[in-house]
From Swiss-Prot:
Function statement: Induces bone formation in conjunction with TGF-beta-1 or TGF-beta-2.
InterPro entries xrefs: Leu-rich_rpt (IPR001611), Leu-rich_rpt_typical-subtyp (IPR003591), LRR_dom_sf (IPR032675), Mimecan/Epiphycan/Opticin (IPR043547)
Cellular component terms (Gene Ontology): collagen-containing extracellular matrix; extracellular space
Protein name (database record): Mimecan
Domain of life, source organism: Eukaryota
LRR repeat feature ranges: 112-131, 132-155, 156-179, 180-199, 200-225, 226-246, 247-277
Gene from which the chain derives: Ogn
Amino acid sequence: METVHSTFLLLLFVPLTQQAPQSQLDSHVNYEYATGNSEETKFSQDYEDKYLDGKSIKEKETMIIPDEKSLQLQKDEVIPSLPTKKENDEMPTCLLCVCLSGSVYCEEVDIDAVPPLPKESAYLYARFNKIKKLTAKDFADMPNLRRLDFTGNLIEDIEDGTFSKLSLLEELTLAENQLLRLPVLPPKLTLLNAKHNKIKSKGIKANTFKKLNKLSFLYLDHNDLESVPPNLPESLRVIHLQFNSISSLTDDTFCKANDTRYIRERIEEIRLEGNPIALGKHPNSFICLKRLPIGSYF
């Protein structure tokens, strides 16, 4: 009787324990054993239920990977344009030197040529470097330059057109170099300092100073001059020619031989010491001066 009863109960519950649908099993397995992808599976199913309902099919959203050309276009839009050639030329100079309010200080930085300068530069101090030559290209398009100082370089030559376009240049210092001659000088020059070079008289043309009507200070001491440069302008106040090889003077060197009343008003100082000349033997050379030159008279 008990056996019959057990069999009856078994037959009663078997229909109630059917296998779950495959989709539910898959979902259950994904949830239990692949938890890392469970959300991804659920999102995919929801997406299909929502958009792929058989009536209005919409494209699935996809991730677009830009190609190399697209990336380059985006890059070009973000990165600012490169500096112009002028800016590239200026930046290195102002990193190596000091650029301040129109003045450029390039002292003792071992440059061997004139660096590119900001166009607004008015003063350049390039002292104690290794510059060997000056050319017209060094100062092209630099109309505002008023003072140049190249003291203590190795300059041997200066092209004649180097300063021709520097119409505002007033002070030019070339002291302590290796110059053998003077170039053509700009018309508004007030000071020329070329002391401690190797300049000879043949290295100065007859008209070098003739038209320099604003020149006040001339320093040519410690060179190899055999005579005083000709045609010195009336504007000169100070002339330094000491320690050269000057051995003779004429009545026209500083004065006018044919005009005994002529007085050279502006001359304040002439230095001729250290030359192989006895100034006392040339009294007529100084008759127009208010002060006698400094030097040996005997």
